[in-house]
Amino acid sequence: MQRITILGATGSIGESTLDVVRRHPDRYSVHALSAHRQVDKLAAACVEFRPARAVVGSAEAARELEAKLRAAGVPTEVSYGETALESIAEDAGTDAVMAAIVGAAGLRSSLAAARAGKRVLLANKESLVMSGGIFMDAVREHGATLLPIDSEHNAIFQCLPTSDPRYGAGVSKVLLTASGGPFRTRDPSTLHDITPDQACAHPKWVMGRKISVDSATMMNKGLEVIEAHWLFGAPAEKIEVLIHPQSIVHSMVAYADGSVLAQLGNPDMRTPIAYGMAYPERIDSGVTPLDLTVAGGLHFETPDLERFPCLGLAFDALRAGGVAPAVLNAANEVAVEAFLNGKIRFTDIARVVATVLEQPADGSADTLEGVLAADSAARRGAQAQLGSLAGR
């Protein structure tokens, strides 16, 4: 019986993970769950799965959750805050940690799981974008097992040699696929007027609002490029992005002999989640098997960087190295939140990120404190840009 902790249990990844657990009660039990503010969803999960511990973001949310669980007769221990979140990530009572908190907020707890030598199922790409060197060092030094859950990186992991899932061993290129989001064919001159609801209407995947906007700008793919660099040791020039509107081929690996290995499947995050949970075995994920006779043609195209400037900015940050990826991520988080709140235009997201990247960066990528200093400085810089863009 594998005991699992889910960080970000009420998000789309967390709920999909619980669905896989639900299908295999003989293999998995839930040790701990966390959510930031969705108390009702977390309470329902605690009633069903009876975790030993649950963590929320605030004292008020903790009181509300405790009351609900007490009324339901559920003895789950409730706590709140960043320290409590790190505590459940490194808890001796858990074997595997699903790191599914979105954004920089998930960095410390994901890193805590790695430093505790856990089996880390990494859906929080920002952990590697912000502090890739620190994170990978922690995995090696503490004997953690790192399994990528993003569908693209999970696909690459499956296509690389199992004896050494890193760049090398005859690998010539890593090919990340992208759906292109909802604006793949839209005239770039009209993107100025995109609304948050339009940006969040992804044609293939069901995701939260922040990652949906990142998909629409292709910043999500840019962050995944940086993540792939750290996960697989591939240099920027050996990572290629291809738009694949059908979202059937989740990524590919090209080899020196001319072979290209691809992982295919219906677009459902339960597939990579189940793969990570059961690795090296495979289990039923609940996903409908792919029928290639129904899927039809598979099409690929090169991204248009005029339409998707955020993708180019991510490659720039990767090549710059140091804290540039952390700066990129922080500025993007601020800009996307502002867009979702109606404070700036869709096209302003890339403008904010580009402007902040051009500024001298504070902090060092050698320590977590340095990375967090760069993150804070970049957020201040991005906030400073918002005023000049508001109302445009």
Swiss-Prot record:
Gene3D superfamilies: 1.10.1740.10, NAD(P)-binding Rossmann-like Domain (3.40.50.720)
EC number, as in UniProt: 1.1.1.267
GO molecular function, a single term: 1-deoxy-D-xylulose-5-phosphate reductoisomerase activity
First and last residue of the signal peptide: none
Annotated GO biological process: isopentenyl diphosphate biosynthetic process, methylerythritol 4-phosphate pathway involved in terpenoid biosynthetic process
Biological pathway: Isoprenoid biosynthesis; isopentenyl diphosphate biosynthesis via DXP pathway; isopentenyl diphosphate from 1-deoxy-D-xylulose 5-phosphate: step 1/6
Keyword flag ATP-binding: no
Binding of Mn(2+), residues: 150, 152, 224
The protein, known as: 1-deoxy-D-xylulose 5-phosphate reductoisomerase
Species in which this protein is naturally found: Cupriavidus metallidurans (strain ATCC 43123 / DSM 2839 / NBRC 102507 / CH34) (Ralstonia metallidurans)
Gene this protein is translated from: dxr
